[in-house]
Amino acid sequence: MKASQFFISTLKEAPADAEIVSHKLMMRAGMIKKLGAGIYNYMPVGLRVIRKVENIVREEMNRAGAVELSMPVIQPAELWQETGRWDKMGPELLRLKDRHERDFAVQPTSEEVVTDIARTEIRSYKQLPVNFYQIQTKFRDERRPRFGIMRGREFTMKDAYSFDRDIDGLKASYQNMYDAYVRIFQRFGLEFRAVAADNGAIGGSGSHEFHVIADTGEDAIVYCPTSDYAANMEAAEALPLLATRAAPAEELKKTSTPEKAKCEHVAEFLGIPLERTVKSIVLATDSDAGAQIWLLLIRGDHELNEVKASKVPGLADFRFATETEIVDTFGSPPGYLGPIGPKKPVKVVADRTVANMSDFCCGANDRDYHYTGVNWGRDLPEPAVADLRNVVAGDASPDGKGTLDICRGIEVGHVFMLGTRYSESMNATFLDENGKTQPMQMGCYGIGVTRILGAAIEQNYDERGIIWPAAIAPFAVVVCPVGYDRNEAVKAEADRIHAELLAAGVDVILDDRGERPGVMFADWELIGVPHRVVVGDRGLKEGKVEYQGRRDAQATPVAVADVVAHVRGQLAA
């Protein structure tokens, strides 16, 4: 490949609307061009990286025994209505009508379509297991597309779907895909973690996310440095910080706390540790009988985990109570609420840590007043108890093998055990060896192909530009001749090196544009090609060229006769 036959369109400055590093560098490197909100053209440089990612994904999926197919981007609404997702999914599911007023969805995932394939094609246990996958365009109508391709609306995704005869088969398929994902991300050359996760709207029973570690990641990853425990913040278990509850040492006292509606302000005003305060969070669930009010209690320095709250029996479809509902139920505005003496009955659920607290401070259900010296069993009934909070660094690891730490990550892959969530709703069944009809056990497995690009950049860049891991770089090597258009010796040697590297199977590009050295070097450092060979007249007179790795501070002189072998050695390192 020669640069004159390629398309290079770099920018000195990033567009004003580019917010994060990957967005800025992808725009500057000419990898993407914005077409609309969350919609991008992938230019030749960017597409080469996508193809490298896709090739690795495809190789490992095939190695794992998955079978590639392709499903339509536009899908009939009837399939989505069978599973209930047509109504359950919000505006992020793009819906449209054809000329006959028939409803369709633009696929964000393809569970319904692949289940339809399975139910029409699979009849017997002898046809199982099977795992179908595709690498296909997806669309989610994000409310606020941002961060370039990291939170775009149109994207490329690898989605796979396994079908098994029983739970043991599903577990085996799940582990097979988990192992394949580990190989994929190792081949990408990225630092990553696989973490236990919540299944969310897709449904099912088991789930892991794969995160690329990056300081700019939007997700919090909880892990134990001394064990294999890892989970995302939604799923990380928070153990009680107190093993047992101490006996009461204080009397219950109602104390004036004028204009102190936040736990930190109450603690400062009363001169007590924030850890002695309890925060009240009011939720509501709706039914034909009306709204049921819930009071969730967490320690003043902790944060509510809404996913965990939704796991409390009865709270699956909770909403936050309105201020009118709060005042009507507690007789007090928010900021002064607590479990003692609400005007109307409420369901109280305490976080594990709160359940073991004694002599704590909470709202008195009276504006400008709080209780101190509050104790369970003496001042109010024992509560229902649940894990309600986000973990914090230093918490005990649930596996008992150390304490937890927290880092940031970018989710780029997700594996789910769906079970019979879709097969039962869509009647995807098979006949077992006894001739009995059984629902297929399903798993689904996604990788954000285009998102990998942004995540890789967020983890690998410097002040000069992108530093691609070798496996997914747009080119492995760039040959930069200084004076290619005016020095025959330089041109001849650059052409020879380029030709020999091509013959050796190296993905190399020759910059024959005739640009000044500064422009040429800046372009390729910005684009992030891992290896560079510079051919110049001065070096050739000494029988040398210069090799420089993208992370190297200095160039290394290499004999002209040895340069191809040297580069191949660096590629193999």
UniProtKB/Swiss-Prot annotation:
A molecular-function term among this protein's GO annotations: aminoacyl-tRNA deacylase activity
Highest taxon above the source species: Bacteria
Enzyme Commission number: 6.1.1.15
Reactions it catalyzes: tRNA(Pro) + L-proline + ATP = L-prolyl-tRNA(Pro) + AMP + diphosphate
The entry's keywords: Aminoacyl-tRNA synthetase, ATP-binding, Cytoplasm, Ligase, Nucleotide-binding, Protein biosynthesis
Membrane-traversing stretches: none
Chief location category: cytoplasm
GO biological process, one term: prolyl-tRNA aminoacylation
One CC-aspect GO term: cytosol
Cell location: Cytoplasm
Signal peptide extent: none
Top EC class of this enzyme: ligase
Protein family according to the UniProt entry: Belongs to the class-II aminoacyl-tRNA synthetase family. ProS type 1 subfamily.
Domain notes from UniProt: Consists of three domains: the N-terminal catalytic domain, the editing domain and the C-terminal anticodon-binding domain.
Quaternary context: Homodimer.
Record NCBIfam families: PRK09194.1, proS_fam_II
Task of the protein: Catalyzes the attachment of proline to tRNA(Pro) in a two-step reaction: proline is first activated by ATP to form Pro-AMP and then transferred to the acceptor end of tRNA(Pro). As ProRS can inadvertently accommodate and process non-cognate amino acids such as alanine and cysteine, to avoid such errors it has two additional distinct editing activities against alanine. One activity is designated as 'pretransfer' editing and involves the tRNA(Pro)-independent hydrolysis of activated Ala-AMP.
Designated name of the protein: Proline--tRNA ligase
Organism: Cupriavidus metallidurans (strain ATCC 43123 / DSM 2839 / NBRC 102507 / CH34) (Ralstonia metallidurans)
